[in-house]
C-alpha cells in the first residue's frame, strides 16, 4: 500500500492517471488501428464492379469503415477486392498484383463468378479465386448489392480485430495467427432466413 499527501477533498493522483491514460495490449492497439484504416485496391473484371463502384458513393458512406481511399497501386494497399469473372489469362496478373501488396494483406471475393466461377463452367474461367489466392471474406450474389460489400467489410474488420501477430523483431518474418471459424456465414444466417413468413416483391419495400 502506498500513501500520498494531499489536500482534503482534492483529486487523488490515481484518479488523474486513470482519466488521462489508456491501458491495453500492443496487439489489440495494432489490430484496432488496422481494422479502421483499410486501404482497398479494386480489381474489377465485369458486372460486379458496377455494384462495387456504387458502394463508393456518398449514399453508402464507405468512409465509416476507414476504407474510402481507393489505392491506384498495390504497393499502397492492404485489401484486394476481386469482383467479376476471373479468366485464366487474368489469374497470373492478379496473383502478381497480390504479391506486390505489403503484409498484412486481405482478400475479399465479391460475386458468384469470383467465388466459384458462377455460370461460366468452362475451361477459360477460374472456378473460384480461392484456387490461387487466400480469400478472407466471400460476398455472394449475382451481382451482390452494395450493402453486401458493406457487411463484408464489417466481417473483415471483426476478423482483423482477433488476429494475433507475433513480434517479428524477436521471431523473424512470420505470418498472422488467424482464428479458425468453422461456421460458414450461410449457415449462421439460416435460422433468420427460415423464419421469414411473408415474401414480397423487393421493389415494393
UniProtKB/Swiss-Prot annotation:
It is a peripheral membrane protein. The gene is nuoB1. InterPro entries: NADH_UbQ_OxRdtase-like_20kDa, NADH_UQ_OxRdtase_20Kd_su. This is NADH-quinone oxidoreductase subunit B 1. It comes from the Bacteria. Residues 183-193 have a biased composition (Basic and acidic residues). Keywords: 4Fe-4S, Cell inner membrane, Cell membrane, Iron, Iron-sulfur, Membrane, Metal-binding, NAD, Quinone, Translocase, Transport, Ubiquinone. One of its GO terms (biological process) is aerobic respiration. It is an enzyme of class 7 (translocase). NDH-1 is composed of 14 different subunits. Subunits NuoB, C, D, E, F, and G constitute the peripheral sector of the complex. [4Fe-4S] cluster binds at residues 47-48, 113, 142. It holds the Pfam family Oxidored_q6. It comes from Cereibacter sphaeroides (strain ATCC 17025 / ATH 2.4.3). Its cofactor is [4Fe-4S] cluster. Its EC number is 7.1.1.-.
